[in-house]
């Protein structure tokens, strides 16, 4: 069976860090994840997905990620139930996160300019080196991922007509 979840979204409230009686860290948080389509009014709707993360990852999330942070989460879906104080059975579906990654710099999130840069939850702030960076004039919003690189190293491809299927 396969139970894999990959989410990218913004944290809707600061993660809530607690500890179990066995001193295991557990953090709960909610992610706002945009849907891929627009509604009848031309607006994108979002799903608000409850998540839980355990142990060191929970402490790291609580220390580094705050409300509004763009993060990526990998994990699995879990359903559980419990009886509330009124004696009613309550069913909960949530994502149990195995790992997370911060997907933008803190300065970008706080509106201090600069673009997004992927960073690990445990990485310190980016280098404070004041070396100027070369400016790029890329109007294409889609990343290239090396599509323009010549996979044949500029050498001619040798194909005879007998090799072609048509």
UniProtKB/Swiss-Prot annotation:
It comes from Lactococcus lactis subsp. lactis (strain IL1403). GO terms for molecular function: single-stranded DNA binding. GO terms for biological process: DNA recombination; DNA repair; DNA replication. Residues 128-144 have a biased composition (Low complexity). It comes from the Bacteria. The gene is ssb2. Residues 108-166 are annotated as: Disordered. Residues 118-127 have a biased composition (Polar residues). Keywords: DNA damage, DNA recombination, DNA repair, DNA replication, DNA-binding. This is Single-stranded DNA-binding protein 2.
């Amino acid at each position: 069976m396969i139970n894999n979840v990959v989410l990218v979204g913004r944290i809707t409230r600061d993660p809530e860090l607690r500890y179990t009686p066995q001193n295991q860290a557990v953090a709960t948080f909610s992610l706002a994840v945009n849907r891929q389509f627009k509604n009848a009014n031309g607006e994108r709707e979002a799903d608000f997905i409850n998540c839980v993360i355990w142990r060191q990852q929970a402490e790291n999330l609580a220390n580094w990620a705050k409300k509004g942070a763009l993060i990526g989460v990998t994990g699995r879906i879990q359903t559980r139930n419990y009886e509330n104080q009124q004696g009613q059975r309550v069913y909960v579906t949530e994502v149990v996160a195995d790992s997370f990654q911060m997907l933008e710099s803190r300065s970008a999130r706080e509106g201090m300019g600069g673009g997004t840069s992927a960073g690990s939850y445990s990485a310190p702030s980016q280098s404070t080196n004041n070396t100027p960076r070369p400016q790029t004039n890329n109007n294409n919003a889609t990343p290239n991922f090396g599509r323009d690189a010549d996979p044949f190293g500029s050498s001619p491809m040798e194909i005879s007509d007998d090799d072609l299927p048509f």
